[in-house]
């Protein structure tokens, strides 16, 4: 998500962070920590869902969630357009703008898929879709 032209911040609304926290910490062996900017949720020292603010994103400040995806869904999301975008690092890394139109059921599915992509297979097998 790093882009030298952007001003990143920890400015993520509490309700957004709380929703993500609830989703992420419900997954096996996950934990939360402060990232270089924003917050990230991890499994076994691997980040699966960082969230942060971007102050100078067009059309104005935005909140971004990064996640991992695979297979057909990865290709669909790469080409879907707003609110999705390619991060520019990692072949399976995507981002999503979180705003008042966000479909939180979809976010939950994406967070679970990202977790299953990053978690050891034994932990991923414990997750119900």
Locate predicted features.
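Charge-dense, helix-prone N-terminal extensions
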Residues: 1-129
